[in-house]
Amino acid sequence: VEKVFATTSKRILKFKTGDVVSATLLHKEGLSSQITAILKTPHYQRVTIFGDKGWVELIDSSHPDTPGPSELILRMNNGKIKKTNLNWTDTVSANINNFINAVQRKKEYIFTDEEKFQNVAVLDAINKSSLKRKVINIK
């Protein structure tokens, strides 16, 4: 990710960070992606990645630690649409267990150090962009 523009809003919840976040990410490879999360009215999370041959979107209707349906939509330039309903998986517990196994040297952690640093940089840029209301470049 090279650039991030994000906004947040406080509608119902009293969270310091607000209850709605929307971020546009511009990637080095030329792709762009959109992340949206609404923590109330009801909960909604969406990640969409736009490429030159089509787009893919994942929609979650519940928080990662709460059972609920997800839908994956793939739309290609040829007009074909593929929709897949996904069953809930407890990714929060799976990540914690994977981390414990990595600390105990039983398994490799699912994210490389480079991916972890990039994730932190993106989250930091989302925070800065939402506060400054401008595009943030990631170095």
Per-range role (PLM):
Residues 43, 66-68, 132:
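Short loop/turn segments at connectors of secondary-structure elements within structured domains
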Residues 84-97:
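Active-site loop of classical SDR/Rossmann-like NAD(P)-dependent oxidoreductases
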Residues 1-64, 95-108:
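Contiguous beta-strand/loop segments that form the cofactor/metal-binding neighborhood of enzyme cores
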Residues 39-41, 88, 115:
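Structured beta->alpha junctions
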Residues 82-86, 136-138:
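Generic detection of short hydrophobic beta-strand segments and adjacent strand-loop junctions
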